[in-house]
Structure formats: structure tokens, C-alpha cells
Regions:
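Short coil/linker segments at helix-helix boundaries
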Residues: 51-82, 102-103, 110-111
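Canonical positions in the second alpha-helix
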Residues: 32-33, 82-83, 117-118
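Short amphipathic alpha-helical heptad-repeat segments
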Residues: 43-46, 108-112
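Residue register within tetratricopeptide repeats
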Residues: 24, 74, 108-109, 126
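Amphipathic alpha-helical repeat scaffolds of TPR domains
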Residues: 2-15, 36-62, 88-103, 126-141
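Primarily a tetratricopeptide repeat
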Residues: 28, 71-74, 78, 113, ...
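Residues in the short coil linking paired helices within alpha-helical repeat scaffolds
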Residues: 22, 72, 106-107, 141
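Solenoid-repeat scaffolds in large eukaryotic assemblies
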Residues: 26, 59, 111, 128, ...
Length: 148
């Protein structure tokens, strides 16, 4: 079992790797810990790493090609689902779920629900405000396409 100091050190290291776009390293480090010992926060961080790897790739190798690895992004969502009970009223969980749903399903409807809940939890968060606006724009575009 990891103690609090070890977990804090790992979380700090994960943030460094995340900033350097080293998502695979984050995944390997977290998955080296037995699943039943990971807890809520490490599970959410693991989901973030899978989501970022799916969309961006290590060191931005996907760049802006718009290619998303469907298996990885669905795994990211499964990880978030596994801690839904603890996450439902956590702004960060809703943020990760909103972004992941938007990338996985190319549909803003499910992402919009998480984005709105995130914004309700932290109304002043500019990132939450932006995700809500982005989802609203996507939903308008989807509606316009249906009308064509």
C-alpha cells in the first residue's frame, strides 16, 4: 500500500509528465499499482492519461489530425464510470467525463450534461464555461445539419 507521502509524490510526478505530453509514462506508473489500491484520484488521473493519449498522443504525435483512438477513449470513460459514485459531484470528474464523451462520441449531447454539471459546481471556472459554450455550438451545428 502507498502512504500519503508516496501518493503525493506520484501525483506531482504525474503532473510533470502530463505537462510534457508523456501520457504513456503516466499510464505505466499508475497501472504498476494494483487496481484495488489506486483509489479515486489515481483512477481519474489514469483516465486523463488514456484520454490525452487517445486524442493527442505522446509528445503531440497526433497533432491536430483530429484522429482519436476509440479504444483508448472508451477505456478512459470506463475508468471514470468505475468511480462515478465518488465523482458525480466532483468538478474535475465532470470535466474529464465531458471532454472524454465529446471526443469519444463526436456528439455534444452527453458531454453537454457533464459540462453543465461541472459549471454548476464551479460557476467561475473559465474552462467549464468554455466547454459548455463549445457543446452548445456543436449542438447548434448538429441541429443545422439535421435540417439540411
Amino acid at each position: 500500500m502507498m502512504n500519503q507521502a508516496e501518493e503525493a509524490k506520484l501525483l506531482e510526478q504525474l503532473e510533470q509528465w502530463n505537462k510534457k505530453d508523456e501520457y504513456s509514462r503516466c499510464i505505466r506508473a499508475i497501472e504498476a499499482i494494483p487496481e484495488q489500491e489506486r483509489g479515486y484520484l489515481l483512477t481519474v488521473k489514469l483516465s486523463r492519461a488514456y484520454s490525452n493519449l487517445a486524442v493527442l498522443g505522446d509528445h503531440g504525435e497526433h497533432g491536430t489530425d483530429g484522429e482519436v483512438d476509440g479504444d483508448l477513449i472508451r477505456h478512459a470513460i470506463e475508468l471514470l464510470e468505475s468511480v462515478r459514485a465518488q465523482g458525480e459531484n466532483d468538478p474535475y470528474w465532470n470535466a474529464r467525463m465531458g471532454y472524454s464523451c465529446l471526443m469519444a462520441y463526436r456528439s455534444a449531447a452527453s458531454a453537454y450534461e457533464y459540462a453543465k454539471h461541472w459549471l454548476a459546481l464551479v460557476p467561475d471556472d473559465p474552462a467549464a464555461q468554455k466547454l459548455v459554450r463549445d457543446c452548445e455550438e456543436y449542438l447548434e451545428e448538429e441541429k443545422a445539419l439535421e435540417l439540411d
